[in-house]
Curated annotation (Swiss-Prot):
It is found in: Secreted. It comes from Homo sapiens (Human). The modification Phenylalanine amide is found at residue 92. This is Gastrin. Gastrin stimulates the stomach mucosa to produce and secrete hydrochloric acid and the pancreas to secrete its digestive enzymes. It also stimulates smooth muscle contraction and increases blood circulation and water secretion in the stomach and intestine. Residues 96-101 form a propeptide. Residues 1-21 form the signal peptide. One of its GO terms (cellular component) is extracellular region. Two different processing pathways probably exist in antral G-cells. In the dominant pathway progastrin is cleaved at three sites resulting in two major bioactive gastrins, gastrin-34 and gastrin-17. In the putative alternative pathway, progastrin may be processed only at the most C-terminal dibasic site resulting in the synthesis of gastrin-71. Sulfation enhances proteolytic processing, and blocks peptide degradation. Levels of sulfation differ between proteolytically-cleaved gastrins. Thus, gastrin-6 is almost 73% sulfated, whereas the larger gastrins are less than 50% sulfated. Sulfation levels are also tissue-specific. The gene is GAST. Its main location: secreted. The modification Phosphoserine is found at residue 96. One of its GO terms (biological process) is response to food. Residues 22-82 are annotated as: Disordered.
């Protein structure tokens, strides 16, 4: 019996944690500032497509359209070379092959 109660409690907590339901209708929610100037015009249509956001998502703020989010795998610039130099000492296999040639 105790095991069943623990499972039900864990299920209820998980459901509450992952729930995206909004407790208030959209008309009663306070309007959060979205930004200023041109950024606000860009964010509004994308945010309206997403529907009502959860409490936690509203606390984080607008994320913006996916095409405006930076992709860390496409790094360019001088910092890439600095990172390669900083982590070069870990590349034992390549260094061994270069030393033998």
């Amino acid at each position: 019996m105790q095991r069943l109660c623990v499972y039900v409690l864990i299920f209820a907590l998980a459901l509450a944690a992952f729930s995206e339901a909004s407790w208030k209708p959209r008309s009663q929610q306070p309007d959060a500032p979205l930004g200023t100037g041109a950024n606000r015009d860009l964010e509004l249509p994308w945010l309206e497509q997403q529907g009502p956001a959860s409490h936690h998502r509203r606390q984080l703020g607008p994320q913006g359209p996916p095409h405006l989010v930076a992709d860390p795998s496409k790094k360019q610039g001088p910092w890439l070379e600095e990172e390669e130099e900083a982590y070069g000492w870990m590349d034992f296999g390549r260094r061994s092959a270069e030393d033998e040639n």
